[in-house]
C-alpha cells in the first residue's frame, strides 16, 4: 500500500488545498470500486465514475449525508471551510453553488486522508459510492 509522510499543519490547509487532494482520493476509491465490480471497458468505467464523482453527484451525496446527521462537528467545520473557499475560477458544467458544495465534500475527503483518519474516510467513501450508484444509503438497502 502507498505510504505517505504526514503533512505538517494539515489542519491549517485552506479548503481548496484539502479539496485538491480529496478529489484525487475519491477518484481512486471510485475507480477501485468499479474495477472490483467487474467493469473493465474504458468507456463504461468513465461513464460510471463520472456519475459518482461529478460536482452534482458530490453535492447530492453531501446533502443526503447531512440530512442523515452523518458528520461530526469537526467534519462540519471542515465542510464549511471547503464550501466557503473561493477558487477564483468559473466552474465548468455546473453552477457556482453546486461547485462549492462539491468542493466542501472533496475538502472533507482530503482532510480525513491527510489526518490519517482512514476508518472514517473509508466509511464516508463507502456511503458516497453506495449513494452515488443507487441513490440509497447502505443500511437502507436491506429494507
UniProtKB/Swiss-Prot annotation:
<keyword id="KW-0698">rRNA processing</keyword>
<dbReference type="InterPro" id="IPR036389">
    <property type="entry name" value="RNase_III_sf"/>
</dbReference>
<dbReference type="GO" id="GO:0004525">
    <property type="term" value="F:ribonuclease III activity"/>
</dbReference>
<dbReference type="Pfam" id="PF00636">
    <property type="entry name" value="Ribonuclease_3"/>
</dbReference>
<dbReference type="GO" id="GO:0019843">
    <property type="term" value="F:rRNA binding"/>
</dbReference>
<feature type="active site">
    <location>
        <position position="23"/>
    </location>
</feature>
<comment type="similarity">
    <text>Belongs to the MrnC RNase family.</text>
</comment>
<keyword id="KW-0963">Cytoplasm</keyword>
<keyword id="KW-0460">Magnesium</keyword>
<dbReference type="InterPro" id="IPR008226">
    <property type="entry name" value="Mini3_fam"/>
</dbReference>
<keyword id="KW-0540">Nuclease</keyword>
<dbReference type="GO" id="GO:0004540">
    <property type="term" value="F:RNA nuclease activity"/>
</dbReference>
<keyword id="KW-0694">RNA-binding</keyword>
<keyword id="KW-0255">Endonuclease</keyword>
<dbReference type="GO" id="GO:0006364">
    <property type="term" value="P:rRNA processing"/>
</dbReference>
<dbReference type="GO" id="GO:0005737">
    <property type="term" value="C:cytoplasm"/>
</dbReference>
<protein>
    <recommendedName>
        <fullName>Mini-ribonuclease 3</fullName>
        <ecNumber>3.1.26.-</ecNumber>
    </recommendedName>
</protein>
<keyword id="KW-0690">Ribosome biogenesis</keyword>
<comment type="function">
    <text>Involved in correct processing of both the 5' and 3' ends of 23S rRNA precursor. Processes 30S rRNA precursor transcript even in absence of ribonuclease 3 (Rnc); Rnc processes 30S rRNA into smaller rRNA precursors. Cleaves more efficiently on assembled 50S ribosomal subunits. Cleavage is strongly stimulated by ribosomal protein L3 (RplC); 20-30% DMSO can replace RplC, suggesting RplC may alter rRNA conformation.</text>
</comment>
<keyword id="KW-0699">rRNA-binding</keyword>
<dbReference type="InterPro" id="IPR000999">
    <property type="entry name" value="RNase_III_dom"/>
</dbReference>
<keyword id="KW-0378">Hydrolase</keyword>
<comment type="subunit">
    <text>Homodimer.</text>
</comment>
Amino acid at each position: 500500500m502507498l505510504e505517505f509522510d504526514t503533512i505538517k499543519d494539515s489542519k491549517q490547509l485552506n479548503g481548496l488545498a484539502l479539496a485538491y487532494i480529496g478529489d484525487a482520493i475519491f477518484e481512486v476509491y471510485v475507480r477501485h470500486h468499479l474495477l472490483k465490480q467487474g467493469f473493465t471497458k474504458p468507456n463504461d468505467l468513465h461513464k460510471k465514475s463520472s456519475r459518482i464523482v461529478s460536482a452534482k453527484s458530490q453535492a447530492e451525496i453531501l446533502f443526503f449525508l447531512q440530512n442523515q446527521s452523518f458528520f461530526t462537528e469537526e467534519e462540519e467545520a471542515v465542510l464549511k471551510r471547503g464550501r466557503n473557499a473561493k477558487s477564483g475560477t468559473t466552474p465548468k458544467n455546473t453552477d457556482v453553488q453546486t461547485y462549492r458544495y462539491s468542493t466542501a465534500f472533496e475538502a472533507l475527503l482530503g482532510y480525513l486522508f491527510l489526518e490519517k483518519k482512514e476508518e472514517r474516510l473509508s466509511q464516508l467513501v463507502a456511503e458516497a459510492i453506495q449513494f452515488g450508484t443507487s441513490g440509497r444509503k447502505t443500511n437502507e438497502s436491506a429494507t
